[in-house]
Amino acid sequence: MKVSIFKTLYFQVLTAITIGVLLGHFYPEIGAQMKPLGDGFVKLIKMIIAPVIFCTVVTGIAGMESMKAVGRTGAIALLYFEIVSTLALLIGLVVVNVAQPGVGMNIDPATLDAKAVALYAEQASQQGIIPFLLDIIPGSVVGAFASGNILQVLLFAVLFGFALHRLGEKGQLIFNVIESFSRVIFGVINMIMRLAPLGAFGAMAFTIGKYGVGSLVQLGQLILCFYLTCILFVVLVLGTIAKFNGFNIFKFIRYIKEELLIVLGTSSSESVLPRMLDKMENAGCKKSVVGLVIPTGYSFNLDGTSIYLTMAAVFIAQATNTHMDIMHQVTLLVVLLLSSKGAAGVTGSGFIVLAATISAVGHLPLAGLALILGIDRFMSEARALTNLVGNGVATIVVAKWCKQLDNDQLQAVLSNKVLPNVKSSVSVS
C-alpha cells in the first residue's frame, strides 16, 4: 500500500522548515521565540542517544565470531576518517585561496567586538589533544550516560561487548535482554521522530527571526563559497568513493533524504544519529560495523566541519589583511588535523574548534571570529549535512572493506525496492 506524500516525514519536515522561514522573516520577534521547540526536540534525541549506542555496539560486538574482526574494523575506520577528513581540509584551503571571499573587506581587528566571542575563546582554551583523549575515559559509567558523551559511552560499550563475547553461552541471557531493550529504545525513537517537523519548524523560525536574511546578504560570498564547496566535496570526493565501492551517491542521498531534512532544520547531525544507526543496518551493513563507525565518525569524520575550519580561518586572514604565506597555511593545516577531531556533531562545536585553532596558530586575530559569528548558524546547516552524508558513506565503505556488507540488500534499498523487514537473529559467539 502506497503511503500518501502528505503523511511522509520528508514532506512534513520540508513543510515545517518552509513555514519556519516565512514566520522568521515576516514576524521575526515571534520567530525568535520558537527556539524552545527546536531545543526541546534535540534534547529528546540526545536523551536516547546513549542507550542506542550502547545497545547497538554491545549486541554487534558480542554477536561477532571473532574479536580480531572488531579491531580490524576500528583500524580501517580510523584510517578512512583520517584520509577523507584531510582531503576535506585541503579542499577547503584550496577553494578559499582561489575564491578569496574575504579580500577587499579591509576590516581593522581593533574595531571588532571581541566581547562577542569571549565565551567561545574561553571554551577554546580548554581544547587540546591530551584533554580530548583523557575526556574519552569517563569518570564513572553512570556519568558517561548522564552527560551523553558519545565517545565515553562508546568506549564502555566496546569493553562491555568484548566481555560479553568472552562469556560465550553464559552471556546469552544478558545478550537477549540487551537486544530486547534495543527494540524498545527504537520504539521510543519512532515516537520522538513524530515531533521532528515541530522541532525543525522551531529551529528554523528562530534562526531566521534572530539573525535575519540581512546577515546572509552581508557575508553572502563566504556563505555561497562554503555551500558550493560542500556540494563539490559530496559530489566529487564522496561520489567518487561511492562509485569505486559499488553504489551511487545520489541514490544514497535519496535514501537518507528524511534525515537530511531533519538535519537541515535542526542544524545538528546528532539529531538523526539513532535513525542513521537503524538505516545503515537496513542498508546491509552489519550491526558491529554500524555501531563502531557511526558514533566514532561523529568526532573523527566531520567532513563539513573540516571544510568550514580551513575556509573560515583563511577568510578571517583575508578580511583583516593578515598575511598568510604557505608556511602559515601548512601550520594551520597541521593544527587542524588535530583540533578538528575535537568537534562533535552538535550545533556550535565547529565554531569552538575554530576559536581553539586560531588561538593555537597565534598568527590570526581572535577578534576576527566576530566577523562570522552572525552567519555561523547559517553555515552550520551545510556542515551538518555534509557530515551526515560523509558518515553514511564511510559506514558502507568500511563495511565493504571488512566484508561485512550485504551488497544485494544495499542495492535493493538504494533502488527503492520494498524489502521484507527481517532481523536476523544472532547469538553470542
From Swiss-Prot:
Its main location: membrane. It is found in: Cell inner membrane. Pfam families: SDF. It comes from the Bacteria. Gene3D superfamilies: Sodium:dicarboxylate symporter. SUPFAM superfamilies: Proton glutamate symport protein (SSF118215). GO terms for biological process: L-aspartate transmembrane transport. Coiled coil: none annotated. The chain crosses the membrane at residues 5-27, 47-64, 77-99, 141-163, 184-206, 216-238, 330-347, 351-373. The keyword Acyltransferase does not apply. The lineage of its organism: Bacteria, Pseudomonadati, Pseudomonadota, Gammaproteobacteria, Enterobacterales. It comes from Yersinia pestis. It is a multi-pass membrane protein. This is C4-dicarboxylate transport protein. GO terms for molecular function: fumarate transmembrane transporter activity; malate:proton symporter activity; succinate transmembrane transporter activity. Keywords: Cell inner membrane, Cell membrane, Membrane, Symport, Transmembrane, Transmembrane helix, Transport.
